[in-house]
From Swiss-Prot:
Reported function: Catalyzes the decarboxylation of 3-octaprenyl-4-hydroxy benzoate to 2-octaprenylphenol, an intermediate step in ubiquinone biosynthesis.
Record field: catalytic activity: a 4-hydroxy-3-(all-trans-polyprenyl)benzoate + H(+) = a 2-(all-trans-polyprenyl)phenol + CO2
Bound cofactor: record note: Binds 1 prenylated FMN per subunit.
Species, as recorded: Salmonella choleraesuis (strain SC-B67)
Protein name listed in UniProt: 3-octaprenyl-4-hydroxybenzoate carboxy-lyase
BP GO annotations: ubiquinone biosynthetic process
Length: 492
């Protein structure tokens, strides 16, 4: 992988501007609903990232739509094009289950991968740009940040791109996660993390090891794109997101110790929120419009108390909105889809392609094509998708087709479903499985069912009937008609 070089978010914005991928908005625009309207229209048209230089009522510019096209996601991951993300996936598959060299020649073939791994360790700085300006105590005021209100019935302004940094009591490695945070006071946010996410797991372990003690948390806003994307990529549990970001960027990730705790944050981030979660301090979060296109239920989550705000000079506030696809999470899903394919193929070599349609809210429906080898094979692949990567724990529907079907063409997929499936025989229903908390269609919050559709050709043992043979054109006839097609002038 030849990394597209940039050091921090500002470098990346310069790169985008040089390629016509960034638009500066000088007209005053309100972070309350108006920025969402403009960003939504721009994203749906495949437009540029937007830097609102004069948000109404605030002195800090707002960056939106940063990852609004698959190309910009690829650029953030150090690549020129989305197709190159397959190489990122191959590297992750290698790191997840590295294979020792089989000989001297194989060692040389693997050297590029080992060389990339050497870029992984972080570089710790004594001082950093993210600590150029410091507010603490009574000077902490989150209302000075141009936090967006995205939809008319949202409960309050919402931080959407907060890179949350935590560490469990028994872990050397920090966890990075993107969790939305509702603004409820000058120094108070609600930390909405689901129970299986890394930050929530760190918090639960802390409560068990240090009952009654405050849990240190830091949040980075405006980190460099590689670090942000590292937090939403299926990085192996043994690898830190910072290390993976360094791999993407081609240089070690620079971090700095926080002022009030021992957590390490991206040194070049625009803004850092430092603070703690008081055990037992909870608050009702929501409702908010989310990536499903609906407002979610109100539920209680921990309160994050901010004790310090540090930031760069002339800091930029990075934000987004979530709504019915297409939105930024859906675009991220399209790009990261290419990363997932090699990881799945390493575990299941029979998989030819894997596709998460963006209209399926990024992860709720998956289409898999495979080289089927035996009766029941499609069901094995279904179960593998649900269990191998935790990113697909919430995937409700898995459709499995043969490799003569294009997973990314609904015409092909629907044809396979309607001609190769018997609804009773080829539908797999699994009850009482983990489901996204935001999925109000499930009968119980966080618990619901899954459906697998086996749309493959059936083998002996799966059917007693003679199976249909697909129609295939005679290639000689096709060639003869190709030769006279223009002469026929049918469409002239």
């Amino acid at each position: 992988m030849d990394a597209m070089k940039y050091h921090d978010l500002r470098d990346f914005l310069t790169l985008l501007e040089q390629q016509g991928e960034l638009k500066r908005i000088t007209l005053p625009v309100d972070p309350h609903l108006e920025i969402t309207e403009i960003a939504d229209r721009t994203l749906r048209a495949g437009g540029p990232a937007l830097l609102f230089e004069n948000p109404k009522g605030y002195a800090m510019p707002v960056l939106c739509n940063l990852f609004g096209t698959p190309k910009r996601v690829a650029m953030g991951m150090g690549q020129d094009d989305v197709s190159a993300l397959r190489e990122v996936g191959k590297l992750l598959a290698f790191l997840k289950e590295p294979e020792p060299p089989k000989g001297f020649r194989d060692l040389f073939d693997k050297l590029p991968q080992f060389k990339q791994v050497l870029n992984m360790p972080t570089k710790r700085l004594r001082g950093a740009p993210c600590q150029q300006k410091i507010a603490s105590g009574d000077d902490v005021d989150l209302t000075r940040l141009p936090v967006m209100t995205c939809w008319p019935d949202d409960a309050a302004p919402l931080i959407t791109w907060g890179l949350t940094v935590t560490r469990g009591p028994h872990k050397e490695r920090q966890n990075l996660g993107i969790y939305r945070q509702q603004l409820i006071g000058k120094n108070k946010l609600i930390m909405r993390w689901l129970s299986h996410r890394g930050g929530a797991l760190d918090f639960q372990e802390w409560l068990a090891a240090h009952p009654g003690e405050r849990f240190p948390v830091s949040v980075a806003l405006g980190a460099d794109p590689a670090t942000i994307l590292g937090a939403v990529t299926p990085v192996p549990d043994t690898l830190s997101e910072y290390a993976f970001a360094g791999l993407l960027r081609g240089t070690k990730t620079e971090v700095v110790k926080c002022l009030s705790n021992d957590l390490e944050v991206p040194a070049s981030a625009e803004i850092i929120l430092e603070g703690y979660i008081e055990p037992g301090e909870m608050a009702p979060e929501g409702p908010y419009g989310d990536h499903t296109g609906y407002y979610n239920e109100v539920d209680n989550f921990p309160v994050f108390t901010v004790t310090h705000i540090t930031q760069r000079e002339d800091a930029i506030y990075h934000s987004t909105y979530t709504g019915r696809p297409p939105d930024e999470p859906a675009v991220l899903g399209v790009a990261l889809n290419e990363v997932f394919v090699p990881i799945l193929q390493k575990q299941f070599p029979e998989i030819v392609d894997f596709y998460l349609p963006p209209e399926g809210c990024s992860y709720r429906l998956a289409v898999v094509t495979m080289k089927k080898q035996y009766a029941g094979h499609a069901k094995r692949v279904m179960m593998g998708v649900w269990s191998f990567l935790r990113q697909f724990m919430y995937t409700k529907f898995v459709i499995v087709c043969d490799d003569d079907v294009n997973a990314r063409d609904w015409n092909d997929v629907i044809w396979a479903i309607t001609t190769r499936m018997d609804p009773a025989r080829d539908t797999v229903l699994v009850e009482n499985t983990p489901i996204d908390y935001l999925d109000f269609a499930s009968p119980v919050s966080g618990l619901g069912s899954k459906m697998g559709l086996d749309a493959t050709n059936k083998w002996p043992g799966e059917t007693q009937r003679e199976w249909g043979r697909p129609i295939v054109k005679d290639p000689e006839v096709t060639a003869r008609i190709d030769a006279i097609w223009d002469e026929l002038a049918i469409f002239k």
